[in-house]
Amino acid sequence: MTSEFFAAQLRAQISDDTTHPISYYKPEFYTPVDGGTAHLSVVAEDGSAVSATSTINLYFGSKVRSPVSEILFNDEMDDFSSPNITNEFGVPPSPANFIQPGKQPLSSMCPTIMVGQDGQPPSHADHTPMPQAIIYNLWFGYDVKRAVEEPRLHNQLLPNVTTVERNIDQAVTAALETRHHHTQIASTFIAVVQAIVRTAGGWAAASDSRKGGEPAGY
């Protein structure tokens, strides 16, 4: 999945002027969205960086807690596929994601650290909103707070619907529809991004207001 050949195959399927039906992309798996997830981004004085995401998967995980520690148990096994069983998100089973010893399930979590050719970190950000925040910051020149707060869109192929946040620019929605996207307004926010960016004056951090929380530094 990290090879240049695989990336080139995916890139060749992208059309600037139109979207395509699901069969065009020849999908072999689908990635569900996690519900009970938190992310932490940290950069130390010496430039050491940590991007860590933790999850119990669905909201309230398995809805079972330990009677001793009162820790809530996760239901991460639902991220695996099982033959003839459709998961919590309505995603049909995928052979590539079947349960096997020593295997991790597919996940929409995407902790990321980006560095330039000289090893200096230009930025870092999460799944669909992660590349959007990176594009806003690196390509469009938005500061980290604006990049994190910009309205988002999401398409996970199945269902083949492009979900947009309620406050997105209508011109964006119109442009998507001219490319044959079926759009709908998200009932809530689309994921959450926490980001730290190296600037000319030092470091800038942003905590997504979609989920509360604040950046902190010393």
Curated annotation (Swiss-Prot):
Disulfide bonds, paired cysteine numbers: none
Q: Which GO terms describe its cellular component?
A: extracellular exosome
Transmembrane intervals:
none
- Which tissues express it? Placenta and sigmoid tissues.
The annotated active site, in chain numbering, is: 37
- What are the recorded GO MF terms, alphabetically? glutathione hydrolase activity
What PROSITE patterns has UniProt attached to this entry?
G_GLU_TRANSPEPTIDASE
- Organism superkingdom: Eukaryota
Q: Which family does it belong to?
A: Belongs to the gamma-glutamyltransferase family.
Additional info? Corresponds to the light chain of other gamma-glutamyltransferase family members. Has no catalytic activity.
Recorded protein name is Glutathione hydrolase light chain 2
Quote the gene name from the UniProt entry.
Answer: GGTLC2
